[in-house]
Amino acid sequence: MVHFTADEKVAITSLWSKMNVEEAGGEALGRLLVVYPWTQRFFDNFGNLSSPSAILGNPKVKAHGKKVLTSFGDAIKNMDNLKTTFAKLSELHCDKLHVDPENFRLLGNVMVIILATHFGKEFTPEVQAAWQKLVSAVAIALGHKYH
């Protein structure tokens, strides 16, 4: 279990409260699909993923990205109990979707890039460290069923 300090929790929640989940979610998932094209195989029903502009403009990518980031909001509400929070999603991604758990780590890293892009100077090294800790812990929780 990962322990978050009070300062880390403040760093995470203060930025999250300013986050446009719909915009950032679509951007994060879209960037994942562009930068790591092998991840596209999990989204074969999303239609045109043939180019970066097609991916970033794809309404299904945007909608699923919003869903992903919305569930990430659950992590922020339950930072002290991530394994339980993501137990069902871990099971779904492992047993039914067969997603390589490494992809969770990649998505977390993309999220950190999105945060840095959106928040600029507000995304200090301390804030980045807190977020990196969170996205790593979420990736571990999502990969839990694989072990």
From Swiss-Prot:
PROSITE patterns: GLOBIN. Residues 3-147 form the Globin domain. Keywords: Heme, Iron, Metal-binding, Oxygen transport, Phosphoprotein, Transport. It comes from Cebus albifrons. InterPro entries: Globin, Globin-like_sf, Globin/Proto, Hemoglobin_b, Hemoglobin_oxygen_transport. Red blood cells. Belongs to the globin family. One of its GO terms (molecular function) is oxygen carrier activity. Heterotetramer of two alpha chains and two epsilon chains in early embryonic hemoglobin Gower-2; two zeta chains and two epsilon chains in early embryonic hemoglobin Gower-1. The keyword Iron-sulfur does not apply. The epsilon chain is a beta-type chain of early mammalian embryonic hemoglobin. This is Hemoglobin subunit epsilon. Heme b binds at H64, H93. It holds the Pfam family Globin. GO terms for biological process: hydrogen peroxide catabolic process. The modification Phosphoserine is found at S14, S51. GO terms for cellular component: blood microparticle; haptoglobin-hemoglobin complex; hemoglobin complex.
